[in-house]
Structure formats: structure tokens, C-alpha cells
Amino acid sequence: MKVEAQEYELKTGEKILVREGKVADSGALLKTEREYILTSRYLIVSPSDLEQTVADEARWIKELNKNPSSLLLLALHNGNVIGHIDLTGSGEEYEEQSGLISMGMLQEYQNKGLGSILLRVVVEWARQQHQLQVLCLQVSRANKGAIRLYKKAGFKTEGKQPDLAPEEQVDDSESVIMTLNL
């Protein structure tokens, strides 16, 4: 186990559990991911992302759990998956020092402190990993709340990447690249 399960309190007083994701969570995580993919104005996805199967999700979780520089954390409320954060460390020898972060949560749990909790736990874990030196992420320029969250956690804007998605899919298809030196 890379991270011990721990209970946290959201700004609303609701208790959530943050723990590592397991292969057995594949179906529940996939269901939650589909919900926030379909309801978010900011996630940049392709139609193939919605074609992911439970078996695909299980393989992905297994690979993350096998990689010592990767981590998948789930946030649960009343036993239900409400969000996740994953840090994918590269398996390539020349890229071992970097990790890519991805996070998502159900709309009703946004702006309640869940993103801050998940980000804090994954950054603390990454700082304990001797091979990781920098964390990277990509966020829609229109997602001002997420950008504020990442900046508050110490991430710096490194650049932009235009035209990642059709304009009708997101408010602004330009993506911001951010990094955090550990």
C-alpha cells in the first residue's frame, strides 16, 4: 500500500474517505468518470474515452498500482466514488523524474475543498518518492477555479497548447500546461 486510507472533512462538513484505487473499483470509478465527463464543460475528451470498458479500467488501475512512481486515489462519500486523482509516473528511464496528474470529481462535490484535499495528498506522496522531481498537468484555460487551485498548491504555468478539442466541446479549447517542482 502506497497511501493509508484517511477520512477528511469537506467545507460543508461532509466526511469523505480518500484511499488507493483497487482493481475491484473499476466499475464504480468508470461510472463516476463517465458522469463527470458528460457534465463538465472543461474536460477535454474524445468519443473513445466514453467507450472505455470495465476491463479497460481494471487494466489501467492494475498498471498504475504496479508502477512505484504512480498513484491512484479515490474519494468516497457514503461508500460511493465521487472523484479521483491519478499521478502517472513514466516507466521510461529517461523520464522517471516526472509524473502527470489528472483529476476529476462529480459536479456536486466541486468547490467544497475536495480538489484541494486530493491534490495535497498526491503532492505529499510524490514528495516522498525519490525519483519524482516534477509534476505536470494540463487544464482548460477556461477552468479558472482549477487553475486557482493548482496555483495555490504551487504549480506554475509553463505554456499553452491550443486546439485540443472542438470549441463546441469546451468553453475554450486552449489548454494550460502547469508544473510543480518537488
Model-inferred region functions:
Residues 103-105, 111-126, 148-152:
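Conserved acetyl-CoA-binding loop-helix of GNAT-fold acetyltransferases
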Residues 11, 37, 49-108, 119, ...:
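Acetyl-CoA-dependent GNAT
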Residues 16-31:
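A short beta-loop-alpha structural element at the N-terminal edge
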Residues 12, 31-48:
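Helix-loop element at the rim of GNAT/NAT acetyltransferase active sites that forms part
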Residues 151-161:
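Conserved acetyl-CoA-binding loop of GNAT-fold acetyltransferases
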Residues 1-12:
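Short acidic N-proximal helix/loop "leader" segments that mark the beginning
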Residues 119, 126-138:
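Conserved GNAT acetyl-CoA-binding A-motif
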Residues 133, 140-147, 160-182:
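C-terminal "cap" of GNAT-fold acetyltransferases
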